[in-house]
Regions:
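Short, surface-exposed interaction loops/tails
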Residues: 115-161
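Extracellular/periplasmic head regions of type IV pilus-like filament subunits
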Residues: 65-135
Length: 161
């Protein structure tokens, strides 16, 4: 004779239907939550891009102010821009869209249209002409990924900031 404890006799396993209902509920929750993480990642990259661009452009403006007072060419050359602690304090920031901290020179036409050139090799594009009247310097991201939207809801590319 096998005796069972009364507390164990009333127990039973989940049915297949109950397990499937739980799986469906988890699937619906995942479908709602996961796309929001994608948006958060895009927003974080766009914010990092704006911060990095602002930092480098502010450093270029600071260099320009000192150079004008010293009677030197107003904008840094590519070598001066990328030499640590000459224009930018510390290491050059990475482009958050391609992870590269390298800078290349581009033509005036490319800079004016914010062309993306060699995006797998360079994170940033820089055009400088100290001989122009007035002198010109254009610094922008070397990536065309979506980096937010304007007031009308139209996408803004990383190279348009």
């Amino acid at each position: 004779m096998i005796l069972t404890h009364p507390a164990f006799a009333a127990r039973r396993a989940f049915t297949f239907l109950e397990v499937m209902i739980v799986v469906v509920i988890l699937g619906v929750l995942a479908a709602i939550v996961i796309p929001q993480f994608g948006t958060a990642t895009q927003d974080a990259r766009a914010s990092a891009l704006k911060a990095n661009l602002g930092g480098v452009r502010a450093a270029i403006a600071g260099y320009r102010a000192n150079a004008v007072l010293a009677g030197s060419p107003p904008y840094p050359t590519l070598t001066e821009l990328t030499t640590p602690n000459t224009v930018v304090q510390g290491d050059f920031p990475q482009n958050p869209y391609n992870g590269l901290a390298t800078v290349q020179t581009v033509s005036f036409a490319q800079a004016s249209s914010r062309a993306v050139v060699n995006a797998t090799t360079f994170g940033w594009n820089y055009y400088v002409d100290n001989a122009a009247t007035p002198p010109v310097a254009i610094f922008y991201a070397n990536a065309a990924d979506d980096a937010g939207a304007n007031a009308s809801g139209n996408p803004i590319r990383a190279n348009e900031h």
